[in-house]
């Protein structure tokens, strides 16, 4: 089993920890907890770069090795890093588990060394009709991010 972790920090007290685990060539399971967010849906993505020199803005676009459009996690036409939304409770926190087969921890398209980002707004999953729907899901600003690193 390969494991990885990202510690998210950001503006306005938003923070969290996200764990990744993959058995062999199987799907990757992502479990995490976030706090300091406004209640509701927030876009959650793996971005292409693990560069946080300019905060979350330098993490680049969504991880998209196949050159597809933005979409929902269950869509065939989606960025590999499109993980949909997390639903934040009234207390500003969320605990979540996601399983995805497009974000491996090993191999050519490994997400290790890339960044995970939580956004200010909900991800419209590429279906909102906004000019940004097919690139970012119109998910708004980047509130917190962390670089995905291997874990013992």
Swiss-Prot record:
Q: Which cofactor does it need?
A: Cu cation; Zn(2+)
Summarize where Cu cation binds, as residue positions.
Answer: 45, 47, 62, 119
**A molecular-function term among this protein's GO annotations:** copper ion binding
Coiled-coil region list:
none
Q: Which domain of life is it from?
A: Eukaryota
Residues bound to Zn(2+) are 62, 70, 79, 82
User: Subcellular location, in the record's words?
Assistant: Cytoplasm
Free-text comment on the cofactor: Binds 1 copper ion per subunit.
Enzyme class, UniProt record, top EC level: oxidoreductase
- Keywords, sorted A to Z: Antioxidant, Copper, Cytoplasm, Disulfide bond, Metal-binding, Oxidoreductase, Zinc
Recorded catalytic reaction(s): these are:
2 superoxide + 2 H(+) = H2O2 + O2
Q: Which Gene3D superfamilies match?
A: Superoxide dismutase, copper/zinc binding domain (2.60.40.200)
On subunit structure and binding partners, the annotation says: Homodimer.
Similarity remark: Belongs to the Cu-Zn superoxide dismutase family.
* Record's function text: Destroys radicals which are normally produced within the cells and which are toxic to biological systems.
Specify the protein name.
Answer: Superoxide dismutase [Cu-Zn]
Organism listed in the record:
Zantedeschia aethiopica
């Amino acid at each position: 089993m390969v494991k990885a972790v990202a510690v998210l920090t950001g503006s306005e007290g938003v923070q969290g920890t996200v764990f990744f685990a993959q058995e062999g060539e199987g799907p990757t399971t992502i479990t995490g907890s976030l706090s300091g967010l406004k209640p509701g849906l927030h876009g959650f993505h793996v971005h292409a770069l693990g560069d946080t020199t300019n905060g979350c803005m330098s993490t680049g676009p969504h991880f998209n090795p196949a050159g597809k459009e933005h979409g929902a996690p269950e869509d065939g036409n989606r960025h590999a890093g499109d993980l949909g939304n997390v639903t934040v409770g009234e207390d500003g926190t969320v605990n979540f588990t996601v399983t995805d087969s497009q974000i491996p921890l090993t191999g050519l398209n490994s997400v290790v060394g890339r960044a995970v980002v939580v956004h200010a707004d909900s991800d419209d999953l590429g279906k909102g009709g906004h000019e940004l729907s097919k690139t970012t899901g119109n998910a708004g600003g980047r509130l917190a991010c962390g670089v995905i690193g291997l874990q013992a």
